Amino acid sequence: HLLQFNKMLKFETRKNAVPFYAFGCYCGWGGQRRPKDATDRCCFVHDCCYEKVTKCNTKWDFYRYSLKSGYITCGKGTWCKEQICECDRVAAECLRRSLSTYKNEYMFYPDSRCREPSETC
């Protein structure tokens, strides 16, 4: 669920989702072409993860998880809920690891500047 993913982002990065909204070619709604940097690659991998669970309601399905001792742990639920949670958990952790290379120049990056050939998941 988008609100849950936002909480995971805050937990991992100590930032809200705004710095990652419309970042590069993949962060935010949709995605195209080649990721611009490590942060954008996290979003690319997140999109790829969601593509593997296309039959699930990735944006709106609530799942169980906990934030304890510096870790995100996904809880039990339906197959879809567990998979969505794992996609979000892995992405939040990836975005934390990429913070040191975050480039403000890619924030609110226009889609028209995403020109390099696409990568496949």
From Swiss-Prot:
It is an enzyme of class 3 (hydrolase). Its main location: secreted. Keywords: Antibiotic, Antimicrobial, Blood coagulation cascade inhibiting toxin, Calcium, Disulfide bond, Hemostasis impairing toxin, Hydrolase, Lipid degradation, Lipid metabolism, Metal-binding, Secreted, Toxin. Optimum temperature is 10-30 degrees Celsius. Optimum pH is 7.9. Gene3D superfamilies: Phospholipase A2 domain. It catalyses: a 1,2-diacyl-sn-glycero-3-phosphocholine + H2O = a 1-acyl-sn-glycero-3-phosphocholine + a fatty acid + H(+). Its EC number is 3.1.1.4. It comes from the Eukaryota. Disulfide bonds join C25-C114, C27-C43, C42-C94, C48-C121, C49-C87, C56-C80, C74-C85. Expressed by the venom gland. GO terms for biological process: arachidonate secretion; defense response to bacterium; lipid catabolic process; negative regulation of T cell proliferation; phospholipid metabolic process. InterPro entries: PLipase_A2 (IPR001211), PLipase_A2_Asp_AS (IPR033112), PLipase_A2_dom (IPR016090), PLipase_A2_dom_sf (IPR036444), PLipase_A2_His_AS (IPR033113). Activated by heparin. Inhibited by its chaperone crotapotin. Pfam families: Phospholip_A2_1. The active site is at H46, D88. GO terms for molecular function: calcium ion binding; calcium-dependent phospholipase A2 activity; phospholipid binding; toxin activity. Ca(2+) binds at Y26, G28, G30, D47. Binds 1 Ca(2+) ion. GO terms for cellular component: extracellular region. When this protein is associated with crotapotin (F5 or F7), it forms the crotoxin protein. Snake venom phospholipase A2 (PLA2) that has anticoagulant activity and inhibits bactericial growth of the Gram-negative bacteria Xanthomonas axonopodis pv. passiflorae (in monomeric form). PLA2 catalyzes the calcium-dependent hydrolysis of the 2-acyl groups in 3-sn-phosphoglycerides. Belongs to the phospholipase A2 family. Group II subfamily. D49 sub-subfamily. This is Basic phospholipase A2 F17.
